[in-house]
């Protein structure tokens, strides 16, 4: 099992990176975010239409911050989700599954690194043409020392090539 924290500014290619990984990795991988539950709450209880803009990003960031300060909820929720998912896998799949976890905040990333140790890797996708959003989650994306840095300034074929190289690196680790 590996937990890969994938990060980057908005629209930096995090989902595309995980999708290419899933396409080429011979074992199972899943792609989740620590903000998923907050998004569901916003849609169900606050009328959010699912479209991301500066206002909705700020709202999500603040809700996640409050939940984290209240009871470490985003982290604990994801740890529980990983544990339950892993328990339901056949034993033969548990060793090689990869959990992509989107997490923006450096202090939250560190919680995963502390919990999963050598099973946890961190990746930052960087794009030169991306504007940083107006919230603390997005503003602090670069304030962490990641294990891997992916420059996503080319086309999708270039990103896919980098994903293939990344897969080889993690197989060797």
Each language-model region and where it sits:
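ATP-dependent small-molecule kinase phosphotransfer cores
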Residues: 33-98, 104
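Conserved lysine of the Walker
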Residues: 14
